[in-house]
Each structure stands twice: as C-alpha cells, then as structure tokens.
Design a protein with these regions (language model features):
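Tubulin/FtsZ superfamily GTPase core signature
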Residues: 1-200
C-alpha cells in the first residue's frame, strides 16, 4: 500500500511532528522543510496526489483512494480522511509527543481533514496544536463561512489553536501582491510553529 510513505530516519527526533494538511498547510510545511528546520519531523497529507508528488517532504499520506483533491468540498475530504484513518494512526505511533496540525481553512481538504487528523492525535494522548489560516476577504463569503466552520470544528479537537487571519496580515503589509500575501501567510505559519517548537 503506497498510499502512505514514511521515511522517518532512525535516530531523528520524531517527538514533535508538523503535519501540513491540504494545499495551504502543505505549502507551509514544504516551506519549513526547505528552510531546514531539523528538530521536528514533517508530514504532508492531501487528497490531491499531484500535490503530494510535488512536495519535497519525504513523509506523505494520501487521504482517500482517489487522489484527485476534494474540489473545495470539506465533506468529501472528511470521507477520504476516514478511509485513511489507519495510516494517520500509524503516523502518530512512533513516539510522537506533540503535533502541529497546519492547514488553510476554507478549501476542501484543510477544512475537512485537519479536524479529523487533530482528533486522532488528541485521542492518542498527543499534545495537539492547530495552526490555521482563514481566507482573504476577496476569496469570498462562502469560503470564509466554510473556513469559520472548519475553525470551530478543529478547535474542539486540539489543545491549543492559533488562527492567522490572512486579511489582517494584508492590512499590516499593504504593499503585498497576492502571491507575496500568500507567502507571508506561509511565513507566519512557519514562524508560529518554529517558535512554539523551540519553547518546548
């Protein structure tokens, strides 16, 4: 079963795991991985097989068997994640003590899958921290409403939740282009996870 690929190097610290779920979370984790943060292990989880293949992160879980993404439908991502629940449990069964679940809320996979992955970790007694973004205003009300539902759901399944409001970030950095705005959001996610990991 090549749906879940784990290449955790032995002797490497698996105590803190940073899990990127969906497009936004995956981008943030790819970015952190490329920055060479060493004291944590990284995993990307996605319903979109292509996004997983494009990720430099060696540890990946494809959620569900289709591999075609969730098409902005959290319900579809939820079903896919339930299908892959054993892979998710296995990912956490290596001595993980703390998990950061990072996702962009508002799309399908981040919104639907992240709360379930967080719940698995928390149910296993792992200290679970959610770091999520909510969309820019121009992404539309439907996406924002969907994101807020996701935030509410993940908040029930984590020990701590950090919500990064992309719109607020844009107000702080008014000169940002759209691409840079997303990059800045990724940076903020990275810095948050890195800071918390260093405290511990």
């Amino acid at each position: 079963n090549d749906m879940a690929i784990f290449n955790f190097q032995t002797g490497k610290p698996n105590i803190i795991k940073v899990i990127g779920v969906g497009g936004g979370g995956g981008n943030a984790v790819n970015h952190m991985y490329n920055e060479g943060i060493h004291d944590v292990s990284f995993v990307v989880c996605n319903t979109d097989n292509k996004a997983l293949q494009d990720s430099p992160v060696p540890n990946k879980i494809q959620l569900g068997s289709e591999g075609l993404g969730a098409g902005n439908r959290p319900e579809k991502a939820r079903q896919a994640t339930e299908e892959s629940i054993e892979d998710i449990k296995k990912m956490f069964s290596d001595g993980t003590k703390m998990a950061f679940i990072t996702a962009g809320m508002g799309g399908g996979t981040g919104t639907g899958a992240a709360p379930i992955i967080a719940k698995v970790a928390k149910d296993m007694g792992i200290l679970t921290v959610g770091i999520v973004t909510i969309p820019f205003r121009w992404e539309g009300n439907r996406k924002i409403d969907q994101a807020l539902d996701g935030v509410e759901e993940i908040s029930r399944n984590v020990d701590a939740l950090l919500v990064i409001n992309n719109e607020r970030l844009r107000e702080l950095y008014q000169e940002l282009t759209v691409t840079n705005a997303f990059a800045k959001a990724d940076d903020t996610l990275c810095n948050a996870a890195r800071s918390i990991a260093e405290i511990i």
